[in-house]
Each structure stands twice: as structure tokens, then as C-alpha cells.
A protein has these predicted regions:
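Inter-lobe connector of SF1/SF2 helicase motors
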Residues: 1-60, 64, 71-77, 83
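Conserved SF2 helicase motif VI
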Residues: 204-222
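Phosphate/oxyanion-binding active-site loops and adjacent basic polyanion-contact surfaces
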Residues: 57-69, 127-132, 204
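Short, high-confidence coil segments that cap the C-terminus of an alpha-helix
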Residues: 81-83, 172-173
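Conserved RecA-like ASCE P-loop NTPase motor core of nucleic-acid helicases/translocases
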Residues: 84-92
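Conserved helicase motor "Helicase C" RecA-like lobe of SF1/SF2 P-loop NTPases
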Residues: 92-153
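Conserved helicase ATPase core of P-loop NTP-dependent helicases/translocases
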Residues: 133-140, 145-180
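A short beta-strand element within the Helicase C-terminal
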Residues: 187-201
Length: 222
């Protein structure tokens, strides 16, 4: 296990979470405005990366994500000759699918609807930060070919999923990232697996067993 020390920003934000919890327990906050479930959820996001909570915060060295990237790269280099593969599990900050324009336009008072009607271009929005994109960009920047990195979320049909799993088994795709729900049970890509990275901890203990079961299974050549 690799231990990442909290940044100063994370330490300050944890104090804020504690203050929120005190208010909730004292009954001075409307449960619809704040509650322990929200606080716990925010704590999980903060524990993964401070930029999930506020993407304007700096990308600091030594964080959980950056240590994971370094670890992935080292294993990737060491396993080059045998095309060894890795899985990265992360249930938080997953890739977000883009809604079709036609569907979004049907929503009342949707700004896209008004833009389509008046041909006024919408202002560009800064893409939301996701850990998945951040890791992929950093791996590529350090020399890993883009076609060796894949997100399970991109295989949105059974045919595509079957093709993706085949590429992982043969070592064409060497780093596969996904959530427990999408990459847990039924993901049989163990042939060349050398490492499994848990970036976060799922709610249910059984989900950790599902993750572990992707690599510790019959057919793993390592």
C-alpha cells in the first residue's frame, strides 16, 4: 500500500467538513441543506483529489493521483517485454457522457434551446475535471502510447466491451480504468495482469472483493 500525505488545502477542507458535521449533529442545519451523507460523499471526493471539490486548486506533487501515475508508469516500463497489463479502479470522478443536443434542447428553459432558436453561439465552458482524464493525460505525457490506455466507460456496447477485453488480454491495451460497477463482475482480463490499483474505497466491502477478483483468478500468467 502507498500512503499519500494530505495537502494543506485538504487539511483545511477536512476541518470544514468537521465543522459541518458538528452543525448537523447539533440539529441546527436543515437536513435538506446538509447531512452526514453529503459530508461523507464530499470527504471521499476530497480524499481522492482536492481538484474534484474545486478544480481551481493546484495539482500538487505527492498526491494520491500523482503517486498512482508514477506507480503505473514504473510497472508499465518493467512489463514492456511481456506486455503486462494493469487495472485502475475508481468509483469517483468518472468520465461523464455528453448528452445529445437534441435531448438537451427538449428541456424547458435550456440555454441550448434558446441558442438553437436564435443562432447565438453558447459560451465555451471549461471541461469538468475528472481523475480519469487527468491520469490518462499524465501517462501520455510520460511516454505511454494513447492507444494502450482505455476507459471501460468507452466500451458502451457488449461488442465494444468484448473487443476491449480481448485487447487487454493480448496486451494491446495495457492500462484499463473503470469503476467497480462497470469493471467488477464479468471482467475477465486476467491473462497478463500484473497490478491492480484501488484509487478509492467503495461503499460496500464486497466491492473490494470484486475488484481483487479481477486479478487473483485462474488464467493469470503472473
Amino acid at each position: 500500500n502507498i500512503v499519500a500525505q494530505p495537502t494543506e488545502h485538504q487539511q483545511e477542507m477536512v476541518k470544514a467538513l468537521s465543522e459541518r458535521a458538528s452543525l448537523v449533529h447539533s440539529g441546527t442545519v436543515d437536513p435538506s441543506q446538509d447531512n452526514m451523507l453529503k459530508i461523507t460523499s464530499d470527504g471521499r471526493k476530497l480524499g481522492l483529489d482536492q481538484r474534484i471539490v474545486n478544480q481551481m486548486l493546484p495539482d500538487e506533487p505527492g498526491t494520491k493521483v500523482n503517486q498512482c501515475v508514477d506507480n503505473i508508469m514504473q510497472i508499465w516500463r518493467d512489463g514492456e517485454a511481456d506486455k503486462l497489463t494493469q487495472l485502475v479502479f475508481c468509483d469517483i470522478s468518472t468520465p461523464q457522457a455528453k448528452a445529445p443536443a437534441s435531448k438537451a434542447a427538449k428541456t424547458l428553459d435550456n440555454p441550448l434551446l434558446h441558442a438553437l432558436e436564435s443562432t447565438v453561439p453558447l459560451p465555451e465552458q471549461e471541461p469538468a475535471f475528472t481523475v480519469y482524464d487527468d491520469i490518462r493525460q499524465k501517462l501520455i505525457a510520460q511516454g505511454m502510447p494513447a492507444d494502450q490506455i482505455a476507459f471501460i466507460h468507452e466500451a458502451n456496447t457488449e461488442v465494444r466491451k468484448k473487443e476491449l477485453f480481448s485487447k487487454v488480454r493480448t496486451g494491446q491495451v495495457r492500462v484499463l480504468m473503470g469503476s467497480t460497477a462497470k469493471m467488477g463482475a464479468g471482467t475477465n482480463v486476467q491473462d497478463r495482469l500484473m497490478a491492480l490499483h484501488d484509487l478509492d474505497c467503495p461503499w460496500r466491502p464486497g466491492d473490494l472483493a470484486q475488484r481483487k477478483g479481477r486479478i487473483e483468478r485462474q488464467g493469470n500468467q503472473n
